[in-house]
Amino acid sequence: MLSIDLTGKRALVAGVADDGGFGFAITKALAEAGASVCVGTWPPALGIFETLLRRGKLDASLALSDGRKLEFERIYALDADFDTLEDAPEEVRAQKRYRDRGDFSIEGVANQLREDFGEGSLDVVVHSLANGPE
């Protein structure tokens, strides 16, 4: 583990939908270093991820080395294929796994972060999208 102190810092890890990928491991490492962590999850996977969390199916994976439980400060619907909501075709926006998720675009998540935490409140951004644009 890196010896780094991120206490008081906020991170957004894009590409977390379960406990099996690099994004989840990076999220844990950031939390271990003291950061508050938000994640962006692909809208079609978000409901499943929320259910796994709610039912405690990820509890063992959420355990940090100091005994704390990893807590996501926020979980945002994020589809990085779309810079703005207008870029998403209507047939995508109308799909049941998208339509009630608000603005799931990159711009939408950035705006939501500003609304939730204020301007300049994000210190670390991690791109960990399995199939997303770079």
Question: What positions do the PLM features span?
Answer:
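Short-chain dehydrogenase/reductase
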Residues: 1-134
